[in-house]
Amino acid sequence: MYNISDVDRNFVISTGMKRDDIRFFDARNDPFRLYGLMFENGRFCRMTNSAAKNVSDAVFRLNRNTAGGRVRFVTDSEYVAISAKMDNIGRMSHFSLTGSAGFDLLYSKDSNGDLLYKKAFVPPYDMKDGYESVIDFDSRKKRVVEINFPLYSDLISLNIGLCADCVLEKAPDYKIDKPVVYYGSSITQGACASSPGKTYQSIISVMLDCDYLNLGFSGSAKGEQAMADYIKNLEMSAFVLDYDYNALTIQDLTETHEKMFITIRKAQPDLPIVILSRPKCLLNEEDICRFNVIKKTYDNAVCFGDKNVYLLSGSYLMNDLTGNEGLVDDIHPTDVGFMSIARNLGNLLKEIILK
């Protein structure tokens, strides 16, 4: 047996900084701007710990996963480094470590331009409590930088390393500053994207220049009333409801789906709500039954005069680019699958938010 990095240097993962002029900053402090996360009890989380605990033990644990977390800033540094401390590393055989436990970087060509994907801060395979990594630019000029956080790992601290003499400023606001809130399953959380910036929420965020909150809870999105009561009070530009395949049975889905929709609709009568079904083209009998349950939620809302509810089937979401080939394991999307979802859902969100 041999190590591929011994024969192909492109697979060597460098974790040393090797920068004499580096200065580190805590990502929680100004002028850095944190999105999609809060900081409680010494760690990052996606909703308050008390609210998560009130939903279920599983949601309380997964709440520490930093899916959808981002930090944004403007700098002219020739490089951006990270030093991350993590106390839970998500490792799965069908999920790239750069996605489950890595950070990646998006940037603009100037201080106000559209974001472009640069690359991942690739973690070492054997890391135990975090890692350090650096990404270089080929020139020194002011640009917006966005660092996406790991999808399935827990983060205690993040320090960002920049040239000691660099410009460091607050990033401009998102064009759509009220977040789109996504609630759902492992797919919503980001499995199995190759890096955090490849999830459909991140792609849509770049498409629309919008903030977002990822409330995907792997295997644990059951449409609980406690979760509905938490979400209904959030300030948001749109809500995406996507958990049909996490309900244990069709009966469970029937008992919770419309109830969750109504809870949020009563609290926010004018909020655009998009209902999704599982992203899959080749449906079995149970898939069809589950789709019929969520379609009934939609049909009933329309019947009662709701003009701000929308339904996108999973087969429609996937057919744009990929069909069923966009799934890793007949459940979780590949990067191409996420892109297909992002195109179709993003076009709808653009229409309904910006109308």
Regions found by a protein language model. Give the residues of each.
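A general structural detector for well-ordered alpha-helical segments in enzyme core domains, enriched
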Residues: 200, 256-260, 290-297
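Serine-esterase "nucleophile elbow" of acetyl-processing enzymes
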Residues: 137-139, 145-221, 225-235
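Structural motif
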Residues: 146-148, 240-242, 274
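Catalytic His-Asp segment of secreted/periplasmic serine-dependent ester chemistry enzymes
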Residues: 283-355
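A short helix->loop->beta-strand "cap" motif at the edges of active sites that frequently abuts
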Residues: 268-273
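Oxyanion-hole/transition-state-stabilizing segment in secreted/luminal serine hydrolases
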Residues: 204, 221-259, 263-267, 278-283
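Active-site-proximal beta-strand/loop segments in catalytic clefts of secreted hydrolases
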Residues: 184, 215-218, 242-245, 276-279, ...
